[in-house]
From Swiss-Prot:
Residues of the Thioredoxin domain: 2-107
Domain of life: Bacteria
Species this chain originates from: Synechocystis sp. (strain ATCC 27184 / PCC 6803 / Kazusa)
MF terms in GO: protein-disulfide reductase activity
Designated name of the protein: Thioredoxin-like protein slr1139
Length: 109
């Protein structure tokens, strides 16, 4: 499964009631570190898309999801599992370190 870009209107539907864990990548077009992280997020979506739903949400036009997830800076990640927020991370992170973080919550990584 590829990376799916969502908006505030789709946030609840795409993150809640899912059969697999959901990773939400919060980003901004003006954010340099976000651009650096984008390939890692895309690779994770490609490599684990059958077991992990990966969503991309631009922060500026989507303030409701940003507030709901208490995102204070970008890039930011939120991992939902069984409708619960189980992992948060703010700031740029390299793919190996991101996989390490995800591995703590996901047994298939």
């Amino acid at each position: 499964m590829s990376l799916l870009e969502i908006t505030d209107a789709e946030f609840e539907q795409e993150t809640q009631g899912q059969t697999k864990p959901v990773l939400v990548y919060f980003w901004a077009s003006w954010c340099g570190p976000c651009r650096l992280m984008a390939p890692a997020i895309q690779a994770i979506a490609k490599d684990y898309g059958d077991k992990l739903k990966v969503l991309k949400l631009e922060v500026d036009p989507n303030p409701a999801a940003v507030a709901q997830c208490k995102v204070e800076g970008v890039p930011a990640l939120r991992l939902f599992k069984n409708n619960e927020l189980v992992m948060t991370h703010e700031g740029a992170i390299a793919k190996p370190k991101l996989l390490e973080l995800l591995k703590e919550e996901l047994d298939f990584i």
